[in-house]
Amino acid sequence: MTEKFQKSSKNIMKIKQKKICAALVVLAVAIILCGVTKWQQNQAEIAMEEAEMERMADVPPLYAGILAEIRQNEMVLLEENQEVLIAAAERAAHPENNVYTFLQGPKSWSEGRTWSGEWSNEYVKGNYFGSFGCGLCCMANIYCTYTDYTCSPWDMYEYARQVSGYSPTRKVGAIGWADMKVTLRKCGFDCSLHNKPESYEKFQEQIKNAKGAVVLVCSRDDDTYWENTGGHYVNISLYNEETDEVFLGDPGGPSRNREFIPLRYVYDALKTASQYQYMLVNDYREENNEWKQDGIDENWVEP
């Protein structure tokens, strides 16, 4: 009985082993067939890609050609306009380079300082231009900076005599606020006259929103920056919010001219004894420019 059971068990094991072997063979064959199929598919795809590449080799590369042509044209434009682009970049990096800041005095002219000119030696009713021309220099700075034209401070003197009530005397040669505003209006500028506000923040905001300003400073009000100055017109522009500074055009101070200074210095030194303390340059309109003077005839030291 036991022998029969053992033989039967061995037979069952053999049968199972045969079935397992058969299954393994089938699985192996399936794997091989799958691999062959995948390889065939890859080969077919490679063949299609090669055929497509051969076909495209005979076709003009339209889009690639267009891109290449565009890039070539861009390079040509860059080369042709290199100086213009460099100048534009320079203007963006250093906007103060576009601001005119004429000097009024004969000493600056005799020393050959940049921005000085022979107008300093013009003689009017007992006074040399160098002793009274700060306001006219400021006006010429505005005209040359914000228009496409140029003029000298002496040109501005002659025009102010024509279109406003400006009439210098032996005692007073400087131009007044009203005549300054009228003359610049004839040049196309919208300007407004102001008194020193009680709040520094209000002054800040006004300067920030204006193209620039002519301000009247006096060391009797504050001598932190200007010393021994009874009354002197200067230009300020290019207000910088981050530093709270402005670019200074000082016709009578060659060592101060073209410096960035704290706006607070200007506010503190505004001449309160004057009818007005500053004039804002708000806008320029070409169609309102009745003068259109262009060119400087006098000898001067250009930057």
Task: Set out the residue ranges of the language-model regions.
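N-terminal targeting leaders characterized by basic, low-complexity, disordered sequences
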Residues: M1-N11
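N-terminal Sec-pathway targeting helices
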Residues: K10-L27
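Extracytoplasmic/periplasmic, Sec-exported soluble proteins
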Residues: G126-G135, D148, V172-G176, N195, ...
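Mid-length scaffold segments of soluble, non-membrane domains
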Residues: C151, Q162-K196
